[in-house]
Amino acid sequence: MNLNATLVAQMVVFFILWWVVAKFIWPPLVKALDERAKKIADGLAAADKGKAELELANKRVEQALTEARTEGAQRIADAEKRAQMTADEIKQNAQAEAARIVAQAKAEAEQQAVRVRESLRDQVAVLAVKGAEQILKREVNAQVHADLLTQLKAEL
C-alpha cells in the first residue's frame, strides 16, 4: 500500500469535490445567505421605520386629542356663557314685563278709584239734592231736620 498514492488520490478527490462545491453549491448557498441577510436587514429597517412612524402617529394623535379637549372645553365655556347671557336677558325681560304689568295694574286701579269717586260724588250730589228737596218741602223744624239728616246718613 502506497501512502503517497493514496494521499495524492485523496487530494485529487478533495480538490474535485472542492471545485464542485465552489462552482455549483457554494454560490447559491452564499446567494441565499446574502438574500436572507438582506431580508433581515430590510425587515429591521422597516421595523425601525414603522416604530418611528408609530411614534410620530402617537404624537399626532396626542396633539389632536389635546386640541380636541381644548376646543371642547372652549365650546363648553362658550355655551355656558351664551346660556348665562340668555338667562340674564330672559330675567331682564321678565323684570321689565313684571314692571309694565304692575304699572298697568296701578294705572287701572287708579282709574277705577277715580270712577268710584266720581260715582260716589254723583250719588252724594243726588242724595243731597233729595235731602234738600225733602227739607224744603216740609216746614222748618229742628227735630225733623235732625231726623232727615240721620236718614241721609243711613242711606250714605
Curated annotation (Swiss-Prot):
GO terms for cellular component: plasma membrane; proton-transporting ATP synthase complex. The keyword Ubl conjugation does not apply. Keywords: ATP synthesis, Cell inner membrane, Cell membrane, CF(0), Hydrogen ion transport, Ion transport, Membrane, Transmembrane, Transmembrane helix, Transport. It comes from the Bacteria. F(1)F(0) ATP synthase produces ATP from ADP in the presence of a proton or sodium gradient. F-type ATPases consist of two structural domains, F(1) containing the extramembraneous catalytic core and F(0) containing the membrane proton channel, linked together by a central stalk and a peripheral stalk. During catalysis, ATP synthesis in the catalytic domain of F(1) is coupled via a rotary mechanism of the central stalk subunits to proton translocation. Component of the F(0) channel, it forms part of the peripheral stalk, linking F(1) to F(0). NCBIfam families: ATP_synt_b, PRK05759.1-2. F-type ATPases have 2 components, F(1) - the catalytic core - and F(0) - the membrane proton channel. F(1) has five subunits: alpha(3), beta(3), gamma(1), delta(1), epsilon(1). F(0) has three main subunits: a(1), b(2) and c(10-14). The alpha and beta chains form an alternating ring which encloses part of the gamma chain. F(1) is attached to F(0) by a central stalk formed by the gamma and epsilon chains, while a peripheral stalk is formed by the delta and b chains. This is ATP synthase subunit b 1. It comes from Ralstonia nicotianae (strain ATCC BAA-1114 / GMI1000).
